[in-house]
Amino acid sequence: MLEVGKKTVRVSLDQALAGQADSPLHVHLGQGLSRGERMDWAIQKATELGANEITPIVSERCEVRLKDERADKRLAHWRQVAISACEQCGRSTLPVIHPPVTLAEWLSSAKADLKLVLHPVAEPLTSHAKPATLAFLIGPEGGLSEAEVEQAKAAGFHAARLGPRVLRTETAPVVALSVAQQLWGDF
């Protein structure tokens, strides 16, 4: 720093560092709204693993209901979680944390080359060709109902499974994003 004033600061730039490149795979995560720290953990890890957009989804089995002021506070909190995760992992761009929406709203607006809904009885994630953009739909505690899975399929989503075990709602995005980055991204 060369000079500090009441309203200004003058600095001299000694060295420019290249920012960490983002993954070539653009990922939009639709994450079922979950209780307490589970949602924080899912957002934190999804940010660290390169998600570009994260949308909390209100679905049939969702146990969390956010209204007005409380929803605004949670959204601000989740955005701070993403900022902290970016600082921790050295990521130079923040993911967009969208306000919570219903499943129907998200399904009608999700745009991606490959849209996947996680389901324990489906083809493996590895059976899909490389996309440039990817949307993942992950259910809340208790999962998505069969009607919701069918609704997602009708909206152009393909059912995919991550393996032989059913994962917790906060674990599924970690595994899904890790596998996607390994297959098609920058791992």
Could you say what each language-model-derived stretch is?
Residues 1-3:
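Conserved hydrophobic positions within beta-strands
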Residues 5-6, 10, 14-116:
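RNA substrate-binding interface of SAM-dependent RNA methyltransferases
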Residues 33, 140, 170-171:
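Conserved residues at beta->alpha junctions
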Residues 38, 141-145, 165:
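Gly/Ser/Thr-rich beta-alpha loop segments that engage phosphate groups in nucleotides
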Residues 101-107, 123-125, 167:
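A short acidic, often aromatic-flanked loop/helix-cap motif at beta-alpha or helix-coil junctions
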Residues 110-149, 157-160:
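Active-site/ligand-binding-proximal alpha/beta "capping" segment
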Residues 146-187:
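Structured adenosyl-cofactor binding patch, chiefly the S-adenosyl-L-methionine
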